[in-house]
């Protein structure tokens, strides 16, 4: 039976933080997507069809190209390997990939091969027609040899491989099987976004990512219920040697099925505008998470959140780390304990994601050496002023400069761990300077909170926050509570 309990947020955010160090090798069908938008105001006099008055046109990379675009957008490195034509569509794809910053050495443009393109025509953002230009043709011997050569050359520098099969010819006639065998020999995981009914050509892949309909077609009958999904996935695992299957289930989320265990992740989509390219986003994010150390269930949870973001966009969409982080906060909540301890750059990305979600972000700071009731009261009051609270924590060196050589009593790691475990605190950032000014400038919180022993004109960073449209709040302190006082009592042997 499928388990429905979601993974904890810590491994999800930890994996996302590692995306920047991942390189993904992407092989498959590159497609040029065109989007023509306009209005329909009359019926043609030539035939009973509407006349679309064009108002604008955009182009984007589709198919394996959209997988590459999502990987790069999420801060990782992508190496595309494919064969396209020397036509206008092919030239456009090479240019787009180069502008994106992806490597293009693995692309081969061949005369006599048509680059696939899909043109979508919409009236007021409602799609009314799709026009495809393509020729489904397997690679010839020369094209195949070139693709395998490029693949082998790039494989050593990649942590994971994606085969993006849109059935246009690149992975037909045993090419997919040969690439999978090369990956297995090299010890590299390979994920497949499959096409068609015959999954034997993907035998030995680490995982496949069919949607519910594709999964049913692969086993010869429709699947809907949880147990049907599990049975179908395990049939494919047994027949073709997959390590696991990740089945996307539209509004019902995703199922991760292995030989012995299955988990279900509920959908996170808020409002669906366009499903174009959502599967590309899912496999791109899943691959990055897996290569970043997440287990398959955690990786699927991240990919599921990513899919929920892009279906809320129009066109062949991609997403950013900030959008993905925000989606995970909606679905899994904030990180806890030590995983809420961030460096300044990670905190800045987190704050941007919170603000993107419409959440107010507060900031306070201090040494917090020996935690006492006064600290807890201050943090509780600060958190009551905002949706998310970031705590700037003086480093050990900073505390020594401010308080003297006998301080801190607790080192910065211990202090940060204790503070991060408090419900009032959403993130802790250790800073080395004597004041948090640079950190405040980097985060630009909406609300800056300090104790009432300050005045607004003496609060460090008050002018920065106010100039950015934020506000400064002074909260009452608990009388008689301080770390210095606590240390004095300990030295005197007093507990009164």
From Swiss-Prot:
Keywords: ATP-binding, Carbohydrate metabolism, Kinase, Multifunctional enzyme, Nucleotide-binding, Nucleotidyltransferase, Transferase. Its EC number is 2.7.1.167, 2.7.7.70. It catalyses: D-glycero-beta-D-manno-heptose 7-phosphate + ATP = D-glycero-beta-D-manno-heptose 1,7-bisphosphate + ADP + H(+); D-glycero-beta-D-manno-heptose 1-phosphate + ATP + H(+) = ADP-D-glycero-beta-D-manno-heptose + diphosphate. CDD domains: RfaE_like. One of its GO terms (biological process) is ADP-L-glycero-beta-D-manno-heptose biosynthetic process. It is an enzyme of class 2 (transferase). Residues 1-335 are annotated as: Ribokinase. This is Bifunctional protein HldE. The lineage of its organism: Bacteria, Pseudomonadati, Pseudomonadota, Alphaproteobacteria, Hyphomicrobiales.
């Amino acid at each position: 039976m499928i388990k429905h309990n979601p993974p904890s947020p810590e491994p999800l955010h930890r994996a996302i933080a590692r995306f920047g160090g991942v390189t993904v090798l992407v092989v498959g069908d590159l497609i040029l997507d065109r989007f023509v938008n306009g209005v329909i105001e009359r019926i043609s006099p030539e035939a009973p069809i509407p006349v679309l008055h064009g108002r604008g046109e955009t182009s984007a990379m589709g198919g394996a190209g959209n997988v590459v675009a999502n990987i790069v957008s999420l801060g990782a490195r992508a190496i595309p390997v494919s064969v396209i034509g020397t036509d206008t569509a092919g030239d456009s794809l090479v240019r787009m990939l180069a502008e994106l910053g992806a490597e293009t050495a693995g692309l081969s443009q061949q005369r006599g091969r048509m680059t696939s393109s899909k043109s979508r025509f919409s009236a007021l953002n409602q799609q009314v027609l799709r026009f495809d230009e393509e020729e489904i043709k397997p690679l010839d011997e020369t094209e195949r040899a070139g693709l395998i050569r490029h693949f082998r050359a790039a494989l050593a520098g990649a942590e994971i491989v994606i085969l993006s099969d849109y059935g246009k010819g690149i992975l037909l006639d045993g090419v997919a099987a040969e690439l999978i065998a090369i990956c297995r020999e090299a010890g590299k995981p390979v994920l497949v976004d499959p096409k068609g009914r015959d999954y034997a050509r993907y035998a030995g892949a680490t995982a496949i990512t069919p949607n519910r309909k594709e999964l049913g077609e692969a086993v010869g009958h429709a699947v809907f219920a949880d147990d049907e999904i599990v049975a179908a996935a395990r049939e494919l695992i047994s027949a073709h040697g997959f390590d696991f299957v990740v089945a996307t289930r539209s509004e019902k989320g995703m199922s991760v099925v292995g030989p012995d265990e299955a988990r279900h992740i509920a959908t996170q989509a808020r409002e669906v505008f366009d499903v174009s390219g959502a599967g590309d986003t899912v496999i791109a994010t899943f691959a990055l998470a897996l290569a970043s150390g997440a287990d398959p269930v955690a990786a699927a949870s991240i990919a599921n959140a990513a899919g929920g973001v892009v279906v809320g966009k129009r066109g062949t969409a991609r997403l950013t780390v900030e959008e993905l982080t925000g989606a995970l906060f909606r679905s899994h909540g904030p990180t806890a304990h030590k995983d809420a301890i961030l460096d300044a750059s990670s905190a800045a990305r987190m704050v941007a994601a919170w603000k993107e979600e419409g959440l107010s972000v507060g900031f306070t700071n201090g040494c917090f050496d020996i935690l006492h009731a006064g600290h807890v009261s201050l943090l509780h009051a600060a958190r009551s002023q905002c949706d998310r609270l970031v705590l700037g924590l003086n480093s050990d060196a900073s505390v020594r400069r401010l308080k003297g050589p006998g301080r801190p009593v607790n080192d910065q790691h211990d202090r940060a761990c204790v503070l991060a475990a408090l419900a009032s605190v959403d993130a802790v950032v250790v800073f080395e300077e004597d004041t948090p000014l640079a950190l405040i400038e980097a985060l630009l919180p909406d609300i800056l909170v300090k104790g009432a022993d300050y005045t607004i004109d003496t609060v460090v960073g008050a002018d920065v926050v106010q100039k950015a449209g934020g506000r400064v709040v002074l909260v009452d302190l608990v009388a008689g509570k301080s770390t210095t006082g606590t240390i004095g009592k300990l030295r005197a042997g007093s507990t009164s």
